[in-house]
């Protein structure tokens, strides 16, 4: 009950006036005055609420109108943006078309300039003709000069090799003659020596035979000593002869190796000369092929000249067609440029009109925004004043409630004091009290509902204030968008300026293209005249070149004939060298046969010397036996003179047998010596016959070799 509202207490006091004591009339009047004050404040509060609701409705209507205006402005802005995008896309398309046209025209201009450069390059100027002539002459003369130099170098090499071979041949011939003379001298000396040795041996043999027949022991001893000395000398001579035989064998081997080396060298030289001859023939064929090639190239160059003249006429026709196309393109380009200019002017006027409209709209929006800002400021001031008034009223209501609570507590104390008095009346007043209580509760509920409605209205006001803040933010975004639109308008103005600049550049490029076309026409006229002159000069040069080629052909044929003569001469020389090589080979074979015969003779002499040595040994043994026999006989004769006859007879019998054996061996030795002499005579006769047979062809070869040697020219 202590939380009961003051209006309810006022109503309770108004409903129960008879409950107050007689002394509490002033207090009741006070309470009634407070209740009337409370009702007037409620009325004011309700009026304020109604005013606030009206203002809120006004704000709502203003907000709705602002929202509709904002949507309309947004639609206009989107339309303006779409229109700007469309204009930008159209402008971009037109720019792309113009750039494509410009690129195509530039490409065509570049192609035509390239064709003109190619035609200029194809046009034969006198300088280019001179360069071509020099280049062709270098290309044709360079391989021929290289081959001619190579042929000269090879001829020099062959000449030097031929001189070397000639010098080697003369040196070998002189060496061969010297060796032949030396060999003949050595053979003659050895033959004389062997004849002297044979005569001396025969004389010694006769002396030995006489000594054996005479039988003088002292003289035999001396002769044995002399024979021993002779034997030692013969051994030394035998060793010397063996050394000479080994030297002769080594010389034979060396001469065979030298002959083989010379033969191999000559075979290699023959092969090299044959290869050189083949190379010369191949080069001759290559020169012929090159001549054919040069003639075919000359024909091809003439055909190419005719083709170039045809291409030149075709290029002139194409240039005329291209000039007509360029004129057509110029005309179409002018029409397109005029259309583009008209479209640019039209789009420029539309853009200016739209810009003015947008500026008007932006100014209207700015004025609306300023009005709305001032209205918002006023609304903010009114809301702040109302909030301050509401705060003051709430504080006053709270103070009144506190005061009323204090008075209620006092009344409560008084009522508690009176409760005891009122308990008796309670039963009577329960029905009326319950009804009053319900009424009071209903009033309390109504007051609570009013308080809640006030709170809701405060919340609604706060939400409205927040919405107004959002609207202010949206207005700021609109300001930013308007600034963006202004920037876009400035960019569009810049693009319009660039379009006008590009239009002026296109006009300049068209003028330059016209000038370049005029220059190209003049160049074509000059090129045509120059082509005619160069064609005449080319025909004249072709005739001169044909004459030069014929002269060079005759020169090459003369060179070929000279090379053939040189080749035939070299071939004859090589044949003569091969014939001389064959002769040298036969001579070396004859030398080998002679050396073999000499070796056989030496081997026979060595065998004879061995037999003589054996004979000397046997004679030595015989003399030794004779000496011993004589000593034994002297001993026997000195000691037993009486009985010497039978012993002497017995001793003489073996002596006779010994002498018979010696005679048999001596006869055998004589037979062997006769056989050896016969063999030696046969060998000498065969050698003499071979020498006589070889002498005649050698003399003929010498005469032949001397005659070509005198006839051969010195190539150095």
Curated annotation (Swiss-Prot):
Q: Provide the alphabetized UniProt keywords.
A: Cilium biogenesis/degradation, Coiled coil, Cytoplasm, Cytoskeleton
Its signal peptide is none
Effect of knocking it out? Reduction of olfactory cilia formation.
Annotated InterPro entries: Centro_Cilium_Assembly
Where is this chain compositionally biased, Basic and acidic residues type? 698-707
Q: Which family does it belong to?
A: Belongs to the CEP83 family.
Region (Disordered), start-end ranges:
1-20, 691-716
> What is the recorded name of this protein?
Centrosomal protein of 83 kDa
State where it is primarily located. cytoplasm
Coiled-coil regions in this chain? 55-638
What is the recorded function of this protein according to its Swiss-Prot or TrEMBL entry?
A: Component of the distal appendage region of the centriole involved in the initiation of primary cilium assembly.
Gene3D superfamilies attached to this UniProt entry: 1.10.287.1490
- Cellular component, GO annotation: centriole; cytoplasm
In its UniProt entry, the species of origin is given as: Danio rerio
The encoding gene: cep83
User: Which superkingdom, per the lineage?
Assistant: Eukaryota
Q: Name one GO biological process term.
A: cilium assembly
| Location(s), subcellular | Cytoplasm, Cytoskeleton, Microtubule organizing center, Centrosome, Centriole
């Amino acid at each position: 009950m202590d939380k009961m509202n003051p209006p309810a207490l006022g109503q309770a006091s108004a409903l129960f006036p008879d409950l107050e004591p007689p002394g509490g009339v002033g207090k009741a009047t006070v309470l009634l005055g407070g209740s009337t004050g409370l009702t007037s404040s409620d009325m004011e509060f309700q009026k304020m609420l109604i005013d606030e609701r009206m203002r809120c409705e006004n704000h709502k209507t203003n907000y709705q109108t602002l929202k509709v205006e904002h949507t309309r402005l947004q639609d206009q802005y989107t339309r303006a943006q779409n229109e700007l995008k469309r204009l930008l896309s159209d402008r971009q398309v037109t720019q792309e078309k113009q750039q494509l046209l410009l690129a195509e025209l530039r490409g065509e201009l570049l192609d035509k300039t390239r064709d003109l450069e190619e035609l200029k390059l194809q046009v034969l100027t006198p300088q280019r003709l001179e360069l071509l002539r020099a280049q062709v002459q270098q290309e044709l003369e360079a391989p021929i000069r290289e081959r001619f130099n190579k042929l000269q170098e090879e001829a020099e090499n062959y000449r030097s090799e031929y001189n070397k071979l000639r010098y080697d041949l003369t040196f070998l011939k002189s060496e061969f003659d010297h060796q032949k003379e030396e060999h003949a001298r050595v053979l003659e000396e050895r033959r004389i020596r062997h004849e002297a040795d044979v005569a001396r041996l025969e004389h010694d043999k006769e002396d030995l035979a006489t000594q054996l027949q005479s039988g003088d022991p002292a003289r035999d001893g001396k002769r044995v000593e002399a024979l021993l000395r002779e034997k030692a000398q013969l051994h030394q001579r035998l060793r010397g002869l063996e050394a000479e035989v080994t030297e002769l064998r080594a010389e034979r081997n060396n001469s065979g190796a030298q002959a083989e080396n010379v033969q191999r060298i000559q075979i290699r030289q023959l092969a090299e000369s044959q290869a050189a001859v083949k190379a010369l023939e191949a080069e001759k064929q290559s020169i012929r092929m090159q001549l054919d090639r040069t003639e075919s190239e000359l024909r091809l160059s003439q055909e190419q000249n005719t083709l170039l003249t045809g291409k030149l006429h075709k290029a002139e026709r194409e240039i005329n067609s291209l000039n007509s196309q360029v004129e057509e393109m110029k005309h179409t380009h002018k029409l397109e440029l005029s259309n583009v200019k008209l479209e640019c002017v039209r789009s420029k006027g539309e853009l200016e009109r739209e810009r003015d409209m947008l500026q008007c709209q932006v100014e209207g929006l700015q004025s609306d925004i300023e009005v709305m800002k001032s209205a918002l400021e006023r609304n903010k001031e009114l809301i702040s004043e109302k909030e301050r008034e509401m705060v003051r009223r709430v504080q006053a209501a709270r103070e009144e409630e506190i005061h009323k609570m204090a008075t209620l507590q006092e009344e409560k104390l008084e009522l508690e004091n009176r409760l005891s008095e009122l308990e008796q009346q309670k039963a009577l007043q329960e029905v009326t009290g319950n009804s009053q209580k319900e009424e009071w509760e209903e009033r309390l509920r109504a007051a609570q509902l009013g308080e809640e409605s006030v709170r809701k209205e405060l919340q609604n006001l706060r939400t409205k204030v927040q919405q107004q803040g959002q609207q202010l933010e949206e207005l700021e975004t609109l300001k930013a968008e308007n600034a963006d639109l202004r920037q876009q308008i400035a960019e569009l103005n810049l693009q319009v300026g660039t379009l006008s600049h590009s239009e002026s550049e296109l006009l300049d490029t068209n003028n330059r293209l016209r000038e370049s076309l005029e220059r190209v026409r003049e160049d074509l006229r000059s090129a045509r005249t120059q082509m005619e002159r160069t064609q005449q000069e080319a025909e004249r040069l072709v005739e001169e070149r044909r004459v030069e080629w014929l002269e060079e052909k005759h020169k090459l044929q003369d060179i070929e004939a000279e090379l053939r003569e040189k080749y035939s001469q070299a071939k004859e020389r090589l044949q003569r060298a091969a014939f001389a090589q064959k002769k040298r080979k036969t001579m070396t074979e004859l030398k080998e046969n002679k050396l073999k015969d000499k070796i056989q003779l030496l081997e026979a002499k060595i065998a004879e010397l061995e037999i003589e040595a054996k004979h000397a040994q046997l004679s030595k043994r015989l003399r030794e036996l004779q000496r011993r026999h004589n000593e034994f006989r002297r001993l026997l004769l000195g000691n037993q003179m009486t009985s010497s006859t039978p012993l002497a007879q017995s001793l003489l019998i073996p002596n006779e047998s010994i002498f018979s054996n010696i005679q048999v061996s001596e006869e055998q030795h004589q037979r062997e010596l006769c056989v050896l002499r016969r063999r030696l005579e046969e060998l000498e006769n065969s050698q003499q016959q071979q020498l006589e047979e070889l002498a005649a062809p050698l003399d003929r070869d010498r005469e032949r070799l001397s005659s070509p040697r005198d006839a051969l020219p010195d190539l150095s």
